[in-house]
């Protein structure tokens, strides 16, 4: 059987980046599409394959015992493959044995529990924790904040393309203002150092770098919580700073909650 997996996956990556999906989404979609191809013995998915998708999703549920959310993510990746990359919509995917949705009660922390978690965080992680619990930001929203999104005068935070892909504003908690100012001053020094080294670029949304070539190095567009290292992967263009990785925050908060 003909296998054109690597070339196909490169096309998938290009389609994802053209739509400015997150790196996490890219990694997940590429992984699921690769597993799908392997499941079908390296057969290139050149034609619409609703039955092939159904078989794969059923296998995930019955043999791999994946969760409902994992199965749904796999389906989303495969629909993206056929509709956005191969331009061959599959229509309705039927006769799938669905993974069971676990019954979970939402975890809602009391004010005392939130205060306890925050008391075990410090530095950047404390600021992020304050924005998560005090400003009601989701983790992804918080880490994707740009310098320009923070309005100290109005005590507001602009959330771009938040939940439901909608823009909104939320209140900047007064308790975090001074610490956030100090933090951003440090970030600015980091950015100025990058500029002196010939860098200082940041990834921009919606292809703004093509419309405004200088925006990628502008202070206003820098991430409020940048990663400690510069990404030099050529697939992402010139060396750039991404935001802090979600896992670093998740680990810090989990450790604080266990204390």
PLM region spans:
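Conserved catalytic core of the tyrosine transesterase superfamily
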Residues: 1-259
């Amino acid at each position: 059987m003909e296998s054109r997996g690597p070339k196909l996956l490169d096309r998938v990556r290009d389609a994802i980046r053209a739509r400015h999906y997150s790196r996490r989404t890219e990694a997940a979609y590429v992984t699921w599409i690769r597993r799908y191809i392997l499941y079908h013995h390296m057969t290139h998915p050149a034609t619409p394959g609703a039955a092939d998708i159904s078989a794969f999703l059923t296998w995930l549920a019955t043999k791999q015992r994946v969760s409902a959310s994992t199965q749904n993510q796999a389906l989303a990746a495969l629909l993206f493959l056929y509709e956005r990359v191969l331009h061959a919509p599959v229509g309705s995917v039927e006769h799938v044995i669905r993974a069971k949705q676990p019954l979970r009660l939402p975890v809602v922390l009391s004010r005392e529990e939130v205060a306890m978690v925050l008391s075990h965080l410090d530095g950047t992680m404390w600021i992020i924790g304050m924005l998560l619990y005090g400003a009601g930001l989701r983790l992804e929203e918080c880490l994707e904040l740009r310098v320009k999104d923070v309005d100290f005068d109005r005590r507001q935070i602009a959330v771009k393309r938040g939940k439901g892909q909608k823009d909104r504003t939320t209140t900047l908690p007064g308790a975090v203002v001074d610490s956030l100012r100090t933090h951003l001053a440090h970030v600015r020094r980091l950015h100025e150092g990058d500029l002196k080294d010939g860098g200082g670029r940041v990834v921009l949304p919606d292809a703004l770098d093509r419309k405004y070539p200088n925006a990628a190095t502008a202070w206003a567009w820098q991430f409020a919580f940048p990663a400690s290292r510069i990404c030099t992967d050529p697939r992402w263009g010139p060396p750039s700073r991404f935001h802090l990785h979600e896992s670093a925050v998740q680990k810090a908060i989990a450790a604080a909650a266990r204390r």
